[in-house]
């Protein structure tokens, strides 16, 4: 489960190396909890990665501007 999550998040890692750890953590939490059968944790974690995948791009742009 963890390795699968990191693999999918690998696509986002190319966008920003710093946010890689944060994205992988959220994705692992989502897949891990869902795999465990915790629908409550799965739904919560799942929402994080999806919405979180977009903000990193804006954050990277701000860093580039600096």
UniProtKB/Swiss-Prot annotation:
Q: What is this protein called?
A: Period circadian protein
Q: How does it assemble?
A: Forms a heterodimer with timeless (TIM); the complex then translocates into the nucleus.
Keywords attached to this entry? Biological rhythms, Cytoplasm, Nucleus, Phosphoprotein, Repeat
In residue numbers, the region (Disordered) covers 1-66
Q: What is known of its domains?
A: The run of Gly-Thr is implicated in the maintenance of circadian period at different temperatures. Deletion of the repeat leads to a shortening of the courtship song cycle period, and thus could be important for determining features of species-specific mating behavior.
Where the sequence repeats fall, as residue ranges, is 30-31, 32-33, 35-36, 37-38
Region annotation (4 X 2 AA tandem repeats of G-[TN]) ranges: 30-53
On modification after translation, the UniProt record reads: Phosphorylated with a circadian rhythmicity, probably by the double-time protein (dbt). Phosphorylation could be implicated in the stability of per monomer and in the formation of heterodimer per-tim.
Q: Name one GO cellular component term.
A: nucleus
Residue spans of biased composition, Low complexity class: 9-31
Q: Which domain of life is it from?
A: Eukaryota
Q: Which GO terms describe its biological process?
A: rhythmic process
| Primary localization class, coarse | nucleus
Q: Where in the cell is it found?
A: Nucleus; Cytoplasm, Perinuclear region
The stretch of residues making up the signal peptide is none
Bias type Gly residues, positions? 32-51
What does the record give as the function of this protein?
Essential for biological clock functions. Determines the period length of circadian and ultradian rhythms; an increase in PER dosage leads to shortened circadian rhythms and a decrease leads to lengthened circadian rhythms. Essential for the circadian rhythmicity of locomotor activity, eclosion behavior, and for the rhythmic component of the male courtship song that originates in the thoracic nervous system. The biological cycle depends on the rhythmic formation and nuclear localization of the TIM-PER complex. Light induces the degradation of TIM, which promotes elimination of PER.
């Amino acid at each position: 489960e963890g390795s699968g999550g990191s693999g999918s998040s690998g696509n986002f890692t190319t966008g920003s190396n710093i946010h890689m750890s944060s994205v992988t953590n959220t994705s692992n939490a989502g897949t891990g909890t869902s795999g465990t059968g915790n629908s409550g944790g799965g739904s919560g974690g799942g929402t994080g990665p999806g919405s979180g995948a977009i903000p990193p791009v804006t954050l990277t742009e701000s860093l580039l501007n600096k």
